[in-house]
Amino acid sequence: MTSQIRQNYSTEVEAAVNRLVNLHLRASYTYLSLGFFFDRDDVALEGVGHFFRELAEEKREGAERLLEFQNDRGGRALFQDVQKPSQDEWGKTQEAMEAALAMEKNLNQALLDLHALGSARTDPHLCDFLESHYLDKEVKLIKKMGNHLTNLRRVAGPQPAQTGAPQGSLGEYLFERLTLKHD
């Protein structure tokens, strides 16, 4: 059934919004995996877990905001399968943060591509929506993750030969306590 409210909303933009919803849901799913991995009793980095669980919530809310936009414009939400996270065991905080940063850069590129498509299709409402709700937030999150990675690399220092304890454990613990503390 065709929407009676649809105006200046191309099918290409509609499809791209649906793909972006899926990317947000996949990011949320991945952040849930990360959050609960770091909160396990054998990992016990609650601040890191909390950081990733908050991101899971933000990405889910971002997906819902896109779905509301789709309905407001007369588009149709077409749900796709959400791909499971690439792994179940995430290793050290630095490795997890690197994976999260790569995912955010991919998400940011998808937002930029959608903005460019909106500009090409002369859809100022879409461009304003993305600028108001996503683009600046995404850049700030990428910067924050980059800062966290810099600090994680700094506290990890040079990796000596294995001495029985996992490498970088003290630095990882200090990063979690001093940077991501919550409570």
UniProtKB/Swiss-Prot annotation:
Record note on quaternary structure: Oligomer of 24 subunits. There are two types of subunits: L (light) chain and H (heavy) chain. The major chain can be light or heavy, depending on the species and tissue type. The functional molecule forms a roughly spherical shell with a diameter of 12 nm and contains a central cavity into which the insoluble mineral iron core is deposited. Interacts with NCOA4.
Listed Pfam families: Ferritin
Similarity field: Belongs to the ferritin family.
SUPFAM superfamilies per UniProt: Ferritin-like
Protein name stated in the entry: Ferritin light chain 1
PROSITE patterns linked: FERRITIN_1, FERRITIN_2, FERRITIN_LIKE
Ferritin-like diiron domain: residues covered: 7-156
Cellular compartments annotated: Cytoplasm; Cytoplasmic vesicle, Autophagosome; Autolysosome
Binding site for Fe cation: 54, 57-58, 61, 64
Encoding gene per record: Ftl1
Keywords: Cytoplasm, Cytoplasmic vesicle, Iron, Iron storage, Lysosome, Metal-binding
GO biological process, one term: iron ion transport
Keyword Iron attributed: yes
rRNA processing in keyword set: no
GO molecular function, one term: iron ion binding
GO cellular component terms attached to this protein's record: autolysosome; autophagosome; endocytic vesicle lumen; extracellular region; ferritin complex
Function: Stores iron in a soluble, non-toxic, readily available form. Important for iron homeostasis. Iron is taken up in the ferrous form and deposited as ferric hydroxides after oxidation. Also plays a role in delivery of iron to cells. Mediates iron uptake in capsule cells of the developing kidney. Degraded to release iron upon autophagy activation by nutrient starvation.
